[in-house]
Amino acid sequence: MTTTETPRKVDTGSVRTPAKKQPRSGRRGGLRSAVSATTLLWILAALYGIPVLWFVLSSFKPAGDLFSLPLTLLPHNPTLSGYKEAWDSANFSQYFINTAFVCVITTILTVGASCCTGYALAKYDNKWLKFFFLCILATTMLPSEVMLAPEFLVVRDLGLYNSFGGIILPAVLTATGCFMFRQFFLTVPDELVEAARIDGARELSIFLRIMVPISRPIMLTLAILSFQWRWNDYIWPLLMLNDPEKFTVQIGIQSLVGAQNINWSVLLGGSVISMIPLIAVFLVFQRYVMNADINAGLKD
């Protein structure tokens, strides 16, 4: 008895077709675009980095070598005399304490006020809030010098002249901070807020327990920017303060400039000293600036 084997049907759906090779021209085009983008980034980094590098290295040069020809990037006889003389000639320790106090208090108030304002502008539907937001944006179209005179008169009438409060109060609410928080809260789904309201949460609880934690990246970003703005602020503290014991770092650097001549080695040393806290703050907090998963509390 013989058996005949019937041929099996080939499942055409399970047969994998060999992947088509990408044309070399397409791969070359992608490589060229990547190389060109990388080259452009390196050029931009050099344009920004070389002046800063020259500035820092020049602070280690003696005063006589700064303008000697030919100009060189690296100091031939590196010295710390500029740093020492800058620290001794100006009361930098007191300036650092004053500036740090102003920056920390202003940053905390700026982040808190901007977060509350941005949440109200994003999640409450009111025509007056929209008009208020337009007024906030309109302030960005005015030069800062235009606002100096009215701000000075208001602060003087409040009795805050020659005080840290006079520096802190006008800098609390910023249009940039309100805009950043508003745009972030607009990306938060309204279902997240409605779900919390259905569960019986109050508005203050929704804001503090839900909105504030998920807005941490924006809070840290604004905190870094606000700290930088206040640390580098020069014009407003110069108008507000006349007591040398209350001067900030930037006014202290200006005091290093003589009436007849400028000791550039001392000025560069003081400027580099003033940069150290900003660099430290940025290096510490930059890793916390990341995107948050705002959809974690939503159900499909």
Predicted segments, located by residue:
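Short, intrinsically disordered terminal tails adjacent to the first/last structured region
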Residues: 1-21
